[in-house]
Amino acid sequence: VNADEHLVLPLDLTDQDAMAPAADTVLRHFGRLDQVVHNGGISQRSLVRDTDMAVDRRIMEVNYFGAVALTKAVLPAFIRQGGGRFVVVTSLVGELPTPKRSAYSASKHALHGFFEALRAEEFDNGVRVTLVLPGFIRTQVSVNALTADGGAQGSMDDLQANGMDPVRCARRLVEAVQRGRDQVIIAGREGAGLYLKRWSPALYRRVIRKVKVT
């Protein structure tokens, strides 16, 4: 592996002041920046009534404001060079809110709203957006999910443990980006919930009240 082809920069998504220096470092090293993949985030497993406000705020700071700050740091370079692509890994809950994920769902909805607006604003400047909506992928996201007091859940959800292989998910993501897709759903049967919500919102709401999503 040629070390000159890689640059590793640690970045705290809650440190907004670190975004511009990080973007400048990358631009100085490579001369340009073609894509930014927003994939950092934390999930949640707690009821609204039990969750500390500090937990709600932390989830929004990491999942939403972190992505916004990094986007604003990179956007001027995209415009100067005539374009670039933001790849935004959100979640099915960005369109399908589910119990025990209220702040997490809110953060993903916020990402959808922000990047759909950005897509329209900067289209003529060559800026493109790919929204990625994964379902149950076999990663550590549920293990590290925040509980009501801000501690980690510490265990993997059953549906996560039986979810899609992350390598397969990554390949589908790369394929979607290469094809210039505006949005891609990477999910198993849980993806059917999107169609149910569109065709029969009332039925979807009845179903989600009874389904145990773990």
How would you describe each model-predicted region?
Residues 96, 117-128:
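Active-site-adjacent segment of SDR/Rossmann-fold oxidoreductases
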Residues 91:
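Residue(s) in the substrate-gating loop at a strand-loop-helix junction
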Residues 49, 96-103:
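Active-site loop immediately N-terminal to the catalytic Tyr-X3-Lys motif
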Residues 124-188:
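SDR active-site lid
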Residues 71, 107:
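Active-site helix of classical SDR
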Residues 11-21, 53:
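The beta1-alpha1 cofactor-binding region of Rossmann-like NAD(H)/NADP(H)-dependent oxidoreductases
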